[in-house]
Amino acid sequence: MRTKINIKVVVGVFSFLLPLSFLFSSCSEQMDYKEYSIYDAAYMQKKFERAGGLLSTIYADLDSDFGNYDGATLSSATDEAVYSHDGNAIESFFNGAWSPANANSSLWTTCYHGIAYCNLFLDEFTGLTFDDYVLDKNYMAEMYQYNNYQWEARFLRAYYYFLLVRQYGGVPLITSNMSADDASRQPRATADEVFAFIDSECEAIKDQITKDYGDLGDLAMSPANNGRANNLAVLALRARAALYHASPLFNANNDKNLWQKAAELNKAVLDSCSARKMKLSTDYKGLFIGNTNWSDSKATGEIIFGRRMPTENRNFETYNFPVGMTGAGAGGGGGNCPTYNLVSAYEDGDSRKEQTIACNGDSWPNANTVPLETYYGGVNGLPNAYATPTGYYLKKYVTESVQIAGNGANTCKHVWVTFRLGEFYLNYAEALFNLSGDGYTAPTGYAASAKPSYYINQIRKRAGLKDMETGLSAADFKAAYEKERFVELAFEGHRFFDVRRWKEADKYFTNIQGIDIKKTADGQFTETPKTVQTRQWNDKMYLFPIPQSEILKSGGALTQNPGW
């Protein structure tokens, strides 16, 4: 018989103790937070919703980036964007202020918070029978859902460890409940060990977790469990983690076995998507608009897994609407402004450009039909406060139809796309190229059709582009691939970490450009590239510093990352 649980489990790992009450919620589309006290398994199995609530609490720690740095996103610490408000916290990444004492991220605490809840659930709350409900008509469906929670918890724990390892390298591997004192003294596992844990967990649960919540027959719950991790999310996590493990940051000796594994696992995602009849969306912009990607099949048909924000709001729109708008569009903050580095990467005719970036002369549909004036002296340009310093405004993830000011102000849904099919075409192409060394030839032992260029071209076709140029040298093909990934995944949280895992930040992240737009007397415009920011780079920044507070709490068990 289980006894009352010692509630002093670690949640921030070393930062704070779990309180006597948890915020629990049901697993419906909107997080419905309720407060419960947890004492033991007997209490937990009094109601199914208590177990479901604990899982929802774990899901609530999933990452997103709708302006995590006072409106700025990580894109504004890359060559994707410049944040239009001087002095924003995002500048610490490149102005010399970044340090263990100013660690620039709460992810360490957030991830270990989620991991602690996963360990709590797995150690204490599996194997319950909910005997009081045996005669209920929904008992079998409720039990099916409950029994699936353990696989979801293991997926979420593995996902949190992926977030940690890509940011810090090796971290403490805590896989069971322990006291805060014990947890604070755990040494770092190596990055290889963390990647191995992620891989083994995904292997163990991939055939256990639900494959499709929409195809459960009599076991289906109402409302449908949209947004929960399924078999495909597990495959996607495993494949992405393998790609990172094979990359130069974590694979200094270029071990081809790691690239082989990355290729196999990313191909498995493509094959699984094909078996489910998933295709690249015909609505690229809709992939990132919450009122669309929440449920619209044209968009959701490409999305593998996403983080649904619990409440509707207009915060991201307020951060990123152009300044100088009137009426429904008034009140925008300029925000994360795309760079000329990004804009110049788009080829002529690339449909992704107009769905990602607003340029001088474009219209902003909800506000008015007057073209945007991002030129110097224009309504939406400098020297107006917070106007774009680059000449461009952001469209991607921005719901342009939202009214952010006045009596008609409204809100919208937001879904952060964690995994989508398009990424895995690119991942597979990258792994194949690193095996073959040639962009147009399949690696030894692969089918002749397994050419890196083929999978890149699938992405280009959706954008309305011709196949990529043939006959490129290995170096030029690599550059073309990196450019394709740059534009396809812009503002999705990849660039910050892609350039780091390639160890190419000194190439991409130092000279940040915009355009200087001038209106001539005859109403024409001149556009001249200009340097907007010259950013500092030091190779120690390939990994984050571990927060100094955590180092001190460890009593010497935790070692700091090199250079910090």
Regions inferred by a protein language model and the residue ranges of each:
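Acidic, serine/threonine/proline-rich low-complexity intrinsically disordered regions
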Residues: V171, T175-M178, R185-R188, A236, ...
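C-terminal substrate/ligand-recognition segments
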Residues: S105, C359-Y455
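An aromatic- and glycine-enriched ligand-binding surface/loop that stacks and positions planar moieties
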Residues: S28-E91, G169-V171, F195, D199, ...
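Bacterial N-terminal signal peptides
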Residues: G12-L23
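Bacterial N-terminal signal peptides that target proteins for export
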Residues: R2-F14
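Long, intrinsically disordered, low-complexity segments
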Residues: C27-S28, Y59, C111-G114, F197-D199, ...
